[in-house]
């Protein structure tokens, strides 16, 4: 799959932040936070009795918003297996708003994704899908989920719900297997993968260390719970000058040779490495 290299899905997804759909007046603050992804929240952050109003407020606000293309504005709908999730989907499809992406929570099977893909296709919308992996059932079929639709641009790790589902404490070590499986599935599908937010707002150093662990594991970015976390996340997930220089060298050498593999600085470099280097350079170009 060459989606990272040739597709429109190559973009910076180093950080994301939620903003409540019930309060459109808060959207500008989230958009100005510096996060690469701004997610309008209709699910867990909205009380049941406010769901309808939040949906209506969000659609009305989206019809008026003018956005910088560098910001990926998405909407997290309610679980697609619930009444409010179905109402969310129907409202957005019938509104004609071509969202950059819809975030799908609590996905459990590829069939859910395929159904939503069909709905968006029938409505002639280009909307991508961000899929949250937060249940053990999803882990069991995660490779099929990740490949179930070309609309999927990213997987998100829902660590809080996953820990509850697995009956374990929400710690890095306890959830390492789940994180690793999600990273592998995303890599196999050629899509981005983002880690769960760090929940201790006052422990910036702890967040930084967990973000570094996530980056080293293969995550593209990490969520936030407050704008003050964004700067650090963007720094961690932005390729360093050394990484950029190395990536440029590999891409240039492949372009010159036209071969499928090369030896550069004594190391064998194959096409999968080239794709990752191209991804890094594309991200740097996007955030300049």
Cite the ranges covered by each PLM segment.
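Expand to "…catalyze enediolate/carbanion chemistry for C-C bond making/breaking, isomerization
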Residues: 1-288
């Amino acid at each position: 799959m060459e989606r990272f290299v040739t597709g429109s899905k190559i973009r910076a997804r180093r950080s994301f932040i939620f903003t409540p759909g019930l309060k459109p007046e808060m959207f500008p603050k989230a958009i100005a936070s510096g996060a690469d992804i701004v997610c309008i929240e209709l699910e867990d952050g909205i009380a049941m009795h406010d769901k309808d109003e939040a949906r209506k407020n969000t659609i009305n606000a989206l019809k008026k918003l003018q956005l910088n293309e560098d910001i990926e504005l998405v909407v997290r709908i309610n679980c697609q297996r619930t009444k409010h999730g179905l109402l969310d989907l129907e409202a957005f499809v019938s509104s004609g708003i071509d969202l950059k992406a819809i975030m799908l929570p609590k996905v459990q099977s590829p069939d859910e994704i395929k159904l939503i893909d069909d709905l968006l296709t029938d409505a002639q919308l280009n909307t991508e899908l961000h899929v949250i992996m937060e249940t053990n059932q999803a882990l069991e079929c995660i490779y099929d989920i990740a490949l179930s639709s070309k609309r999927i641009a990213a997987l998100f790790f829902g660590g809080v719900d996953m820990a509850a589902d697995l009956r374990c404490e929400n710690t890095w070590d306890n959830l390492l297997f789940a994180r690793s499986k999600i990273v592998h599935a995303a890599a196999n599908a050629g899509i981005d993968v983002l880690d769960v937010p760090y929940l201790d707002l006052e422990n910036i150093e702890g967040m930084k260390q967990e973000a570094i662990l996530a980056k080293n594991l293969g995550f593209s970015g990490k969520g936030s719970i407050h704008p003050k976390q964004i700067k650090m996340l963007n720094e961690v997930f932005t390729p360093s000058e050394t990484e950029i220089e190395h990536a440029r060298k590999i891409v240039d050498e492949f372009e010159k040779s036209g071969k499928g593999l090369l030896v550069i600085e004594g190391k064998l470099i194959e096409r999968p490495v080239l794709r990752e280097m191209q991804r890094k350079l594309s991200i740097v170009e996007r955030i300049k």
